[in-house]
From Swiss-Prot:
Active site feature: E60, K129, C162
Function: Is an aliphatic amidase with a restricted substrate specificity, as it only hydrolyzes formamide.
Source species, domain of life: Bacteria
Swiss-Prot/TrEMBL GO biological process terms: putrescine biosynthetic process from arginine
Name of the protein this chain belongs to: Formamidase
Family: Belongs to the carbon-nitrogen hydrolase superfamily. Aliphatic amidase family.
Recorded catalytic activity of this chain's protein: formamide + H2O = formate + NH4(+)
Chain ranges of the CN hydrolase domain: 14-257
Amino acid sequence: MNGLGGLNKSPEGVVIGLVQLQLPNVVTRADLARQTERIVWMVGKARRNLSTMDLVVFPEYSLHGLSMDTNPEIMCRLDGPEVTAFKKACVDNRIWGCFSIMEFNPHGNPYNSGLIIDDHGEIKLYYRKLHPWIPVEPWEPGDIGIPVIEGPKGARIALIICHDGMFPEMARECAYKGAEIMIRTAGYTAPIREAWRFTNQANSFQNLMVTANVCMCGSDGSFDSMGEGMIVNFDGAVLAHGTTGRADEIITAEVRPDLVREARINWGVENNIYQLWHRGYVAVKGGAMDCPYTFMQDMVAGTFRLPWEDQVKVTDGSSCGFPAPTRMYGKTAKAAE
């Protein structure tokens, strides 16, 4: 059930549009300005495409492309012209929007950040990618956790970025904090296609949570991104899937946060996020409420260590042309000098 891509919208439905944006090549400030205009135009296209659409989602790297360029001249700020333009586009088109920026960081490497802006032009969600795609990406690891907001129709929404979604703990954190819809934006290329598909479905099923996932699309002359917009229902069933690889196509579906809430309350079999803390409640009252997972205990204690830790060969970005870092997490670049 997806309401024919949102054409037939139910009273409780939220219609999401995933933009499989053509992969750009952004090097200069002028390139950045042109790509900003392109995204603004696509917000308008989304509204013209489907009058029922509540939220339009742009992929990771939609503004900067896949070059991994950390040049401060093309990094964004929350009060900069790019974000200002996105805010205006949401107001002008009466639509919520999810956008990607590479954000200037005066204390270290840039952040890979995501924003959700409402139809009044207000930033409602601001997230910094927790898990950069190492060793390929140079971005500073995020430091503000995973926010969950109230979006269109009161839907509880979270945002994660690309590689984040390969960690089941990320989707679990979103759901634990109440998210009914988890957005996953990405710049992934074709070698990740199958992992992209099954993790999107697993993230939904394991948490009784809708996921809306989209990559960049097309080629910039060096890289080929795959599109693969996927909207997955809370039971893991795919509601909509962009399989043609057609750049600038908008994949749409209606999702039902009210049915997510209903399932979380009423499901017995496979209500996994509840049962995680209530193991074996048939045998013991309330189930076992403990933490039998060694890795969780060790992370909290700061002693997480793999049995093969000392054998791991790739532990910095030097294989991808980045200098080995000397600064520890939590220390500013200036303090490390």
